[in-house]
């Protein structure tokens, strides 16, 4: 009699799944962590809610109202979740039939779109971006049959550039009545003029992902948002967990989204942008750096000579970057989070010391 292992009992797609390699999963023993696009220093908050004996609200009123005011939308157009990553998954669960429907995304881009779909058993289709990392609209059009959700990250992680707004409009017209278009705006605070939040009235099939992990300096809080029209939000509410936000998370999120919290966030953004420009200018003068790409975010993508050796050399010095070599069209590329001036200087000095 054959023995059935625990792994044999698992779903086939889970057995075959490669989990998302988050910055923390990849590890490292560094003291300069520039691989997860986090804010470099901790922001302090005081807990004010002490009712931990009670279950929290599913959609905490103060958080929803504060975020709606900040984003310029109605409270009914906001869903809060455990990071934007949960929003990615909720959209697939609400709109895609496993074994029948597909999602579509455009690499090189964020890795969780495919992981979420594969976990649920939904087909992934890819249409690589053009050489300038803009959308291949003809390629997308050719593959749309059977696609229910299209993910577009703007500004894009890891390349750092915005997607052309006219291309977004064309995509929204192509998908009208066919699929949900998801604009992942995790980094939009660094270029707020480019947000599509004002387009929701025009496009009922548009959804927008947001997070407190980047500019709000709260990656450890795990708090994200989906902005969409009420019909979409109501469907997502059917598949979200009953208590997605703990009471302490909701408490801190509401404080971060207060008028004072928004002012503090914008000050952090200005500081990071100034530091980004300093680091870009320095990188362009370093011999082992072949190319530095423009960025609208809190990170910089650069192409290096012998990038694997450079990555390991800095890793061994406790400077942890993100290797993007395996992404389509990103051979030789490393992604560097913009940190403090001291961290920037550590990177600059280490790279200058590299033998080319």
UniProtKB/Swiss-Prot annotation:
Q: Name one Pfam family in it.
A: Aminotran_1_2
| Residue intervals passing through the bilayer | none
Q: Which UniProt keywords apply?
A: Amino-acid biosynthesis, Aminotransferase, Histidine biosynthesis, Pyridoxal phosphate, Transferase
Q: Which InterPro entries match?
A: Aminotrans_II_pyridoxalP_BS, Aminotransferase_I/II_large, HisP_aminotrans, PyrdxlP-dep_Trfase, PyrdxlP-dep_Trfase_major, PyrdxlP-dep_Trfase_small
| Catalytic reaction list | L-histidinol phosphate + 2-oxoglutarate = 3-(imidazol-4-yl)-2-oxopropyl phosphate + L-glutamate
Instruction: Report the PROSITE patterns cross-referenced here.
Output: AA_TRANSFER_CLASS_2
Q: How does it assemble?
A: Homodimer.
Gene Ontology molecular-function annotations: histidinol-phosphate transaminase activity; pyridoxal phosphate binding
Q: Which family does it belong to?
A: Belongs to the class-II pyridoxal-phosphate-dependent aminotransferase family. Histidinol-phosphate aminotransferase subfamily.
Q: What is its EC number?
A: 2.6.1.9
For this protein, the record's NCBIfam families field holds: hisC (TIGR01141)
Q: Which GO terms describe its biological process?
A: L-histidine biosynthetic process
EC class: transferase
| Positions of modified residues (N6-(pyridoxal phosphate)lysine) | 214
According to UniProt, the name of this protein is Histidinol-phosphate aminotransferase
Q: In which pathway does it act?
A: Amino-acid biosynthesis; L-histidine biosynthesis; L-histidine from 5-phospho-alpha-D-ribose 1-diphosphate: step 7/9
Per the entry, which co-factors are needed? pyridoxal 5'-phosphate
């Amino acid at each position: 009699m054959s023995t059935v292992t625990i792994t044999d009992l698992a779903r086939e797609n889970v057995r075959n799944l490669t989990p998302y390699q988050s910055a923390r999963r990849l590890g490292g023993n560094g003291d300069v962590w520039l691989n997860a696009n986090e804010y470099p220093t901790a922001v302090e908050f005081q807990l004010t809610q002490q009712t931990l004996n009670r279950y929290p609200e599913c959609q905490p009123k103060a958080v929803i109202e504060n975020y709606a005011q900040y984003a310029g939308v109605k409270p009914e157009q906001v869903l809060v979740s455990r990071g934007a990553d949960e929003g990615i998954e909720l959209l697939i669960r609400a709109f895609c039939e496993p074994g029948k429907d597909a999602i579509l995304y455009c690499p090189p881009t964020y890795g969780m779109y495919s992981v979420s779909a594969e976990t649920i058993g939904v087909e992934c289709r890819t249409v690589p971006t053009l050489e300038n990392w803009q959308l291949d609209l003809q390629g997308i059009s050719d593959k749309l049959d059977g696609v229910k959700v299209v993910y577009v990250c703007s500004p894009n992680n890891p390349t750092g550039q915005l997607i052309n707004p006219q291309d977004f409009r064309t995509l929204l017209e192509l998908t009208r009545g066919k699929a949900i278009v998801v604009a992942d705006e995790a980094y939009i605070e660094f270029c707020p003029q480019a947000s599509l939040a004002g387009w929701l009235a025009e496009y009922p099939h548009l959804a927008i992902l947001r997070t407190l992990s980047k500019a709000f300096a709260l990656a450890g809080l795990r708090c994200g948002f989906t902005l969409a029209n009420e019909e979409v939000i109501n469907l997502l509410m059917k598949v979200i967990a009953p208590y997605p936000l703990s009471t302490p998370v909701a408490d801190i999120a509401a404080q971060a989204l207060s008028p004072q919290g928004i002012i503090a966030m914008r000050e952090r953004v200005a500081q990071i942008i100034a530091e980004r420009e300093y680091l870009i200018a320095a990188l362009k003068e370093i011999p082992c750096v072949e190319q530095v790409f423009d960025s609208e975010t809190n990170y910089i993508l650069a192409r290096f000579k012998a990038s694997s050796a450079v990555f390991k050399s800095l890793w061994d010095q406790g400077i942890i970057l993100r290797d993007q070599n395996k992404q389509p069209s990103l051979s030789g590329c490393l992604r560097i989070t913009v940190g403090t001036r001291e961290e920037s200087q550590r990177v600059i000095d280490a790279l200058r010391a590299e033998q080319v």
